[in-house]
Amino acid sequence: MKQIQTIEKGANFSAADFGRLADIKDYVLELAPEVRIPGKVFGGGAVGATGSEFSFQVFAPGQETGFLHTHRTHEELYFFLSGKGEFQVDGDVFPVGEGSVVRVAPEGRRSVRNNGTEPLVMLCVQYRGNAFTAADGADGDILNEPVKW
C-alpha cells in the first residue's frame, strides 16, 4: 500500500508528497477491517491541517462511489483534475471533468462516478460550512521582506 511521504516541517508549515496523480490508485483507505476504498487517501493529518481536511481519489472507468452521503457540518469542494464523469447532488446529475469544481453544502446528498474511458481524478476539500465571512477574504498581509530562493 502506498504511503504519504513527509517533505519538510517547520514551526509554521508542513509539506508532504502524495506522489504522481497517476499513482493515487495505489492508495487504499481503510475505514474498518472490512471497508477498504482503493484509490483514496486523506491528507489533512499528514500536513497538520487545523481547519480543513482533504483527500485525493481516483475512479477507474465505470467506477462510482456506490452510495450517497451528507455531512453534519462540513461543506465540500470537489476539484476534478483529470478524466470525465458525472456528479449527483440531491438527485440532480451533471457532467464533470478536468477543470470542474463542485461545491456541496453539508446537507447535499452527493455521489460521483466515472462514465468516461480514462481515470477520473479529484481532490476534495472539506471544511466547516458557513464559517467563512467577507472579512476573511481580506485576511492576507503582503510583507515587505525579500523572498529567499
Give names to the regions the model predicted.
Residues 50, 88-92:
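Short strand-coil-strand connectors
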Residues 91-107:
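Short acidic-glycine-tyrosine-enriched beta hairpin
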Residues 48-52, 60-64, 84, 128-131:
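Short, charged/polar surface micro-motifs in flexible loops or helix N-caps
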